[in-house]
Amino acid sequence: MAEKKIFGYADKISVKPGDDISFYVHADGTDVVDAQLVRLIHGDAHPAGPGYKEEEIANEANGVWRVRKQFTQVGSFLTVADPEQRLALSGSFSLCTFVHANSPGGGRRQCLLGRWDAFGNRGYGLWLNPDGFLEFGFGDGGEVDYLDAEVPVLKNNWYFVAATFDAKTGVATLYQEGVATRYNSLLSKVANVDFRSHVRETLRFRPVNPPEIPFLLAGARDHHTLRGDFVTQCLNGKLDRPSVFDRVLTRAELDSYRDGGVPPQDGLLAFWDTTQGYTEHGIGDEVIDAGPYGLHAIGYNRPVRAQTGFNWQGRDDCFRLAPQQYGGIEFHDDAIIDCKWELTRSIKVPDVRSGAYAFRLRTGDAKGMREEYVVFFVRPLKPKAPILFLVPTGSYLAYANEHLSFDAEIMQPLAGQSPILSEVDIELYQTAEFGLSLYDHHADGAGVCYSTYRRPILNMRPKARMSSMGVTWQFPADLSIIAWLDHMGYDYEVMTDEDVHREGIDALKPYNVVLSGTHPEYVSEPILDATEDYIGAGGRFIYLGGNGYYWNVGYHSEDPWCMEVRKLNSGMRAWQARPGEYYLATTGQKSGLWKDLGRPPQKLFGVGFISEGFDSARPFRRMPDSWHRRASWIMEGIEGEIIGDFGLAQGAAGGIEIDRYDLTLGTPPHSLIVASSGGHSDNYQTVVEEVLYPYPGLSGSHDYRVRADMVYFTAPNDGAVFSTGSIAFSQSLPYRNFDNNVSRLLGNVVTAFSKPGKLPGWAWTAEEKQWR
C-alpha cells in the first residue's frame, strides 16, 4: 500500500461567520481522514515557550471526510478557442512565431504551437526537440514524421521560426533566423555563432486532425488512464506574435514578417497579437487573435505578461510607453496558480470569535505527512474590539513552499548554519505540484514572480520551522503574537492583507490600534496607503517586525489569491528581473523596493531594513530617549537596561532581520529611540541598498548601523507609532510563559494605544529630544 500522505488547501484565506469556504484535499494511501476544526493559538514547540497550542471547535463538519488522490496541471500555456475547428488543418499550412527559449534541450521536448496529441501521435506541431533543435512534425495516429533544423536554438536569444507544409507535394520547410537587437538577447552581433537554419524535405504522409484535439501555444495535449487529459511538453521561454496560415508562405513573406512582426493577410487563419490588451493598469490572461476569426487564447497558470518582445529597443522600460515592444509572453513548465482540485468539503463558517483557524486533518499516526492544517482567518461580522492584528498574508505567499535549503547556494553561509530537514521539507522539494515561492527560480532559471494560496502551502502551518534557519517563520512565528494577546486577555480581532488591499482605510478605521506581524515584507500600494492614512488620521500602529513594507506587490483583480512581484536592481533579493521587465502585469506599477519608489518604511514606522543574520540574536539596551517624559511610561515595571536577552528565535529579541532609525530616509524628526540592539555577529551584513561601494567593515561587529532600533513617535490627531525593528522581538514574548520584560514592555504599549483619548506623556509631545 502507498505511504499515507495528506495535503490540502482552501479557496479563501479570509472569511466572516456565515461565509462559505471550500476545502480541497489530496490523499495517498487512504480514502478517509479525520477532520477537526481548531483555533490556532501558539505555533512554536520550542521548549523555552508554552509549546504548541490549539483549541478544538465544535462543528458539524468535524469527523470523517472522504478523500482521494488529486491531480494538478503544472506548467503555463495558452488554450485557443476554436469551436469551428478552423485549425484542424487538412491542406497546406504555415506556422510562425518569434521565440526566446529559456532552456532549450536538456532532454525535454517543448511545444511552441500546434494541435498535437502526444498520447495518440496525432496532429501537427512546431517544437524545440530534446536536443534543443527546432523541429516540425505531424502524426497520423501511428507514425510521426519530423523535420529538424541544422543548428540548435541558443538559450536566451530571440529567433523568428516558421514551418510550412505543402499538401500537394508533401514538402515541408523549416525557417530559423536570429533576430537579436542590441538589447533583447543574451548575445550580441560580435558572438561568432550560427543562428540561421533553412531546411526542406518531403514528408511521407499527411497529418490526422481529430476534432477533439485542442490548439495550444506552449504545450501539447497528453492523456493518462487515471488522470485523463492533461497538457505536457510545456515551453520554458517566451513567444511573441505567433500565427497560423492555410497556405505556404514564401521566403520573402517570411523575411518581411521576421523584420517587422507583421504577418501577411492572405491566408491568415490566426494571429495572436501579444502586444494587444495593455492598459495603464496592466494586462490579463487573454491573448487577442487579430486575425479574421477571433480565435482568442486564454492563459492557464498565468503565463507572464509585460515581458519584452523580439523588437525591444532598450529605450523604454515599461509596456505603457512602448506596448508594441512588449509582445513577449513567458511560459514555465513548473508554474502553478491554481491546483483546481476536485472539491472535498464546503462549510459555512460558524459563529466563532475572530482569529486564526484551520481544519486539522489526520490519518494513521498523525505525524509528518499524515497531519495537515488547512489554515484560514476569520474576521468579525462587525468590528467590535479595540485591537486588530493585521495578518501579513502577502508575505506568507512570498515564502510559500520555498526551496531555499535545497536550491539557494548561498543559504548556508547566509544562515551561518546547516539546514535541519524534515520529511515534509523533502516531500515539498520533490513534489512539483506544490509550486514555488517568490524566493525560488523556475527550472529554466527565471525568477518566480507569482505566488498563490490555491495550493497546499506546507510552511503556512502551525509547528512549521524554516529548515535553513531552524526557527519558526511567518505564520507560525506570528502565532506568538496571537498567543500573547490571548494570554494577556486583550480583546482583539484579526484581518488579512487581502482585506486591507480590497477595502483600504475603511477596514482599519474601527480599531484604536493595529498590530503588524513579525515580517510584513510584501505590501501593495492600497495596503501602504491605508496604513499611512490610518496613522495620519489618528490611528495607532505597533510595528512588530523587521524588514517590513519592503517590496511593492500587486494582486490580480479577479484572482485575489494570486500575488505578483518583480525584483529589480536594489534590495536583498533572490533573483533579478530582466532589463525592461520591472513593471507589474497585475497593476501596471513599477515593482521593486518601496524605498526606491519614494516610500521607504522609515517614513511610516520610523525604522527600515538595515541588516539580517540568522545565526544569533542580541538583546536590546535602553537608550537615553527611554527616560524622556514622552516615552518613560513604555518602560514601567522594567528593571535594568537590558531587554530581551532571551527568546525562541536565536535566544534574544533583537535579530533575524532588523531595522534602524534613519532621518535621511524619512524617520519623523521627533521620533524617540527607546532601545537598540548591538554587538551583532559578522553574519549580519549591511543591506545592499544602503551600500554604494562595498568596503571592509560592513558587518555587525564593525558597522554602527547594524542594529535594531525600538522607536516611538506621536502622529497627528492623537495617533502614534511604536516599532520594534526586529523579527525576533515577538518570538521573545512567549518566553517563560509570557512572564518577561519584552512581554511587559509590549503590554504597556498595547494597553495605552488601545484606550481612546490622550496617550501617556502627551503633555510633553512638543518637548525637544534631550539626547541626539
Residue ranges and their predicted role:
Residues 23, 163, 340-353:
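Short, hydrophobic beta-strand segments
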Residues 60-77, 325-345:
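Aromatic sugar-binding surface patches on proteins
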Residues 559-737, 741-748, 752-753:
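Glycine-rich, aromatic-lined ligand/substrate-binding cores of catalytic
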Residues 8, 13-32, 40-308:
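Extracellular glycan-associated modules
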Residues 123-127, 483, 707-715:
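Short, surface-exposed beta-strand/loop micro-motifs that present aromatic residues
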Residues 68-69, 355-361:
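Short, aromatic- and glycine-rich surface loops/edge beta-strands on solvent-exposed regions
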Residues 334-335, 344-347, 352, 470-557, ...:
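Helical hinge/lid and interdomain linker segments adjacent to catalytic or ligand-binding clefts
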Residues 30, 40, 302-336, 366-507, ...:
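Aromatic-Pro/Gly-enriched surface loop or interdomain linker
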